């Protein structure tokens, strides 16, 4: 199974006994004919479900979006969201491996017990581009005589209709008659081109080169930089001064150079990246081993190092600092399950989310991440327009250290790197609670091809404490609970993992919780010179 869907490696003697008792000794039948059995792990992994073996209860727990399933090997009944469901064929074991009938997914997950997802009858005008529309938009611009073969794509997104028409659709159901269009930003070497295409008529509406601007740092730039560093004899020479003889153990991080009006000796018209490096010592955490006071300026067009900036040699810290837990004893924890036995209190219709009095549209942008749009709140029968569109506007991380390897560090994480592109798939039960619904999202990559990000966004309802309580002497207690709906997204930019929560409250307010986890940026220093 995948990283978030795995069977426990530990099997108790009782578990083995159950497996042997339920062993597949003879054909299994459904509706009078032999059932076609398939491996549980591969089948449910492909379906996107999370599977765990519960040693204590001697059963499998299966979680997929709004459904929480418990099933024992050999049992004719499964428990789906707290309700019994008769199985046509039980789960069977053969050679310690679980098998399910090919009808299992349809029987269990299409049983009508989960109504979280609804069919969208009228597409919302702000629905993100589909994979087919992304392919279509790219094909249109590639057919242009102005398109060059090595051009890359920094953004392909919906060209949004007029705001007034979108609101009219949301509030009154009036169809938006404007054709679907796409905005495209391309990078031809160091030259930026902005374009707009009509997806219905398959024609280009705009093609405009943008002057005095730099493009985003793309994922293939990381590979280009690493290759340049590995093959550079000049860089290998400066590594030797620091006792490093194998350049392939050096991990590079390409950073934007900033603007210093020529005082750093760099030309703003060149497409440059400053590269700082770390040493891979085998502990899985190269961030703990910075190669300090060494910066390579790489020209992406020329594909070579333009110059190397050096300061005093600082010894590379070599003490292993793993972060994956290999040096710690894991705390044994009993399972903590959050179930909704009667189903979700929210529904997802296409890209629209409805919870209590809230309705909003949700999509993922390759630059800013989640976009919450056309937010309304039903205030005693009146649908109030709360927010047209909300998203991360931008983010800057200035370090403020004057040293040679730090003074230029002021990352524009969203604008320079694309935080939506760097979305980190969420792990159920760790990054989000077990009752979360996971949403896959599709955005374009730098080649213009659709790229699906699994488990990109999570939605879940949670208990948020008591809303009100009063215990009058001699009278019954009066208490009410508070509920919240959370939309969670995580973006990993280098060593930092940024967590963003949009929190919808029952009282008509919206909160935004933002935080960072991951690994702190560290600086190597000579301890002899540190007080």
Give the residues covered by each predicted segment.
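A short, sequence-level motif marking secondary-structure junctions
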Residues: 72-78, 88-94, 198-203, 229, ...
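Solvent-exposed, polar/charged alpha-helical surfaces in well-ordered, non-transmembrane soluble domains
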Residues: 41-45, 103, 107, 135, ...
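Short polybasic amphipathic segments
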Residues: 59-62, 75-81, 184, 353, ...
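Short, low-complexity cationic-aromatic patches
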Residues: 33-38, 93-99, 173-179, 188, ...
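Primary recognition of N-terminal secretory signal peptides and signal-anchoring hydrophobic helices
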Residues: 2-122
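Post-signal-peptide, soluble extracytosolic/periplasmic N-terminal scaffold domains
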Residues: 63-66, 120-245
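Extended intrinsically disordered, low-complexity coil regions enriched in Ser, Thr, Gly, Ala
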Residues: 50-56, 69-77, 112-119, 148-149, ...
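Beta-strand/loop-rich accessory regions of lumenal/periplasmic or secreted enzymes
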Residues: 163, 215-531
């Amino acid at each position: 199974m995948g990283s978030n869907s795995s069977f426990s490696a530990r099997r108790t003697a009782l578990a083995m006994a159950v497996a042997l008792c339920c062993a597949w000794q003879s054909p299994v039948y459904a509706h009078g004919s032999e059932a076609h059995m398939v491996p549980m792990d591969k089948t449910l992994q492909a379906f996107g479900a999370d599977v765990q073996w519960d040693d204590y209860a001697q059963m499998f727990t299966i979680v997929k979006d709004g459904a929480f399933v418990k099933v024992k090997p050999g049992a004719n009944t499964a428990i789906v969201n707290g309700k019994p469901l008769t199985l046509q064929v039980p789960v069977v074991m053969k050679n310690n491996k679980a098998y399910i009938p090919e009808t299992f997914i349809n029987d269990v997950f299409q049983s009508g017990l989960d109504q979280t997802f609804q069919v969208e009858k009228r597409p919302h005008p702000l629905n993100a581009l589909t994979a087919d529309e992304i392919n279509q938009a790219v094909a249109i611009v590639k057919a242009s005589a102005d398109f060059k073969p090595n051009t890359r794509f920094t953004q392909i997104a919906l060209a949004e209709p007029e705001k007034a028409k979108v609101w009219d659709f949301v509030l009154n159901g009036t169809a938006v008659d404007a054709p679907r269009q796409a905005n495209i930003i391309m990078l031809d070497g160091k030259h930026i081109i902005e374009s707009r295409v009509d997806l219905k008529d398959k024609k280009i509406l705009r093609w405009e080169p943008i002057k005095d601007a730099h493009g985003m740092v793309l994922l293939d730039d990381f590979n280009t930089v690493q290759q340049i560093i590995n093959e550079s004899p000049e860089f290998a020479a400066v590594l030797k001064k620091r006792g490093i003889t194998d350049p392939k153990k050096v991990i590079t991080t390409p950073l934007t150079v900033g603007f210093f009006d020529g005082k750093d000796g760099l030309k703003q018209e060149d497409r440059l990246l400053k590269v700082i490096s770390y040493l891979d010592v085998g502990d899985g955490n190269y961030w703990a081993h910075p190669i300090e006071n060494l910066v390579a300026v790489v020209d992406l067009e020329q594909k070579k190092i333009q110059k190397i900036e050096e300061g005093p040699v600082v010894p590379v810290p070599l003490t292993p600092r793993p972060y994956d837990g290999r040096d710690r004893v894991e705390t044994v924890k009993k399972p903590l399950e959050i179930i909704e036995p009667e189903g979700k209190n929210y529904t997802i219709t296409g890209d629209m989310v409805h919870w209590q009095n809230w309705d909003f549209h949700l999509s993922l942008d390759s630059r800013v991440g989640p976009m919450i749009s056309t937010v309304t709140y039903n205030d005693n029968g009146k649908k109030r327009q709360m927010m047209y569109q909300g998203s991360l506007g931008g983010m800057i991380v200035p370090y403020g250290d004057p040293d040679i390897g730090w003074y230029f560090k002021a990352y524009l994480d969203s604008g320079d790197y694309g935080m939506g592109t760097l979305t980190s798939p969420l792990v159920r039960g760790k990054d989000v609670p077990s009752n979360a619904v996971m949403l896959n999202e599709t955005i374009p990559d730098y080649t213009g091809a659709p790229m699906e990000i699994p488990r990109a966004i999570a939605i879940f309802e949670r208990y948020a404490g008591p809303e009100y309580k009063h215990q009058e002497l001699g009278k019954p207690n009066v208490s009410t609970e508070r509920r919240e709906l959370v939309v969670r997204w995580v973006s990993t930019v280098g060593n930092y993992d940024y967590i963003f929560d949009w929190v919808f409250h029952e009282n008509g307010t919206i909160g935004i919780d933002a935080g960072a986890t991951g690994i702190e940026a560290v600086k190597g220093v000579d301890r002899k010179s540190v007080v």
